[in-house]
Amino acid sequence: MAVTTACTSAASAPQVKPGGRSFTVAAAGDVLIHPELVDQAAKDAKKTGEGEAGLDFGPLLAGIKPVISKADLAICHMETPVGKPRGPFEGYPEFLVPPQILTTLKGVGYDTCSTASNHTYDHGLGAVRRTLNAMDKAGLGHTGSARTPEEAEKINIRDVNGVKVAHLSFSWMSFLNPTPEKEKWAFNQIDTDAIKDAEARAREKGAEVVILSVHWGLEHYNEPSIPQLELAERLTTETGIDLVIGHHAHVVQPIQKVNGTWVAYSLGNQVARHSSPTGLTEEGAIGWFEFRETTDGWDVSARYATTLVDIPPEAEAGEKPPAGAVEDHRVVDVRRALDAPGDLSEERLARYRLAADRTRGFLYNRGAPGGDGLKELTLERD
């Protein structure tokens, strides 16, 4: 039996409840710490004297703090397991990244992270446990993977401005290391019935809003796949989930309302440095969703902020980078950079404009402007 979703169309939206509660959610794309970003953190630690064990990821992500820190609930997607502070670390295809990134994620304002992905089990159950222990130490909430079968049954519910908000996380199957049958509980694999069950348990525990992070789709495609579209249809007709946040494609895909519920198919990469950057893999989006209590559930509006990972050029042997070239990997709040360019070169500004234009186009590609109401975020960035 279909369940009516709490998010209704603009034409039939109920009135905002006088004195009703409200809160904002910021969500971003994959956190994927490639070796070049570890090298950058080592370089930055030498300059700042901050961080742990010679790694400081703070400068890398500082550019998004003015947005992320302003949300009432900020959700990241921690795609990979972490190793020990001094390593060893690994990149693609079996990631093992510095736990120091978790402290930085907390520092820029993230509250909780989804952890179910095709890389969750890259280094087995021991690495899953190490990752969740490190997230606990950093003060980050987590959902999608578990240290024990008992923990796998727990629901991540947070009080956000007096509203009980549950966060769920599910993924397609593991990448190179299939999860042993006896450890299937270690991370949530996509199954519509399992998602329904998790939502039901969240509601039983008092959740008033349920947000689902889902790791799905085809990598490097800016359009959702048929299985994504089919699952989005089922989620928005057979459950009461209030917001769907997608990851995995490593490029931006549309945000649209499906049967009255916002679905962000892919927010691209929050931070990554692929071995062969395409330009699209460096462009991402922060989804910004405002929930307002109405006389009949929740009205949800959607905004977005474009991000870009600045990457230093790779000079040919014996050559020096051109004057004014990017010197460090940095995650850029594109709108903020365009509004206050300072002494940025025309080449840099042109790159930022391209990121803004392309991201807007991909996000709008399934009709989100107009009737759906998706707009660029206007927010005072301190």
Language model features with spans:
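Sec-dependent bacterial lipoprotein signal peptides
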Residues: 1-5
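Acidic, metal/ion-coordinating pockets
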Residues: 7-382
